[in-house]
Amino acid sequence: TAEPPFPSGLRSPAKIAIRAWWDARIQQGRYLSADGRLFHIDSARDFTGLRAELAITATELIGEQGEYRPDRAPPRACRVFLNYDAPWLDENGQATAYRIRAEVALIETGRVQVGDLLEVDRVRYYVVDYADGTDDGIVRGIWLERVQ
């Protein structure tokens, strides 16, 4: 049996196959929420051509339930993937420390800013920096420090 690899970020490494009634709003690049799960649609095909049923391939956005607390705005529920031992690279690309790196879904949080707060499992974290090159319009990587 081929097990999917262990997740290393907010995106599940295994693609999900979904069947749904035809709906013009279900298109590639959109999001689908069902039973507390969040999916980013990779493809949606009307495989019969009759506008009756869709075959959808999607990526599930997984993570721990958290709360994004932007400065001067109401809190928002979100999924957070935490990596407690991510290498922090200096300007030469050398790992100089290990810090907490997180990924959040932009559809749930919007563009997280430095200085904002994330809370996961009753633990609060400050957003201290962006993880360079990780914002792809779906997921944003950020560096965190635990609030003492």
Where do the PLM segments sit?
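Short, conserved turn/kink motifs that form compact alpha/beta structural patches or helix kinks used as
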Residues: 1-148
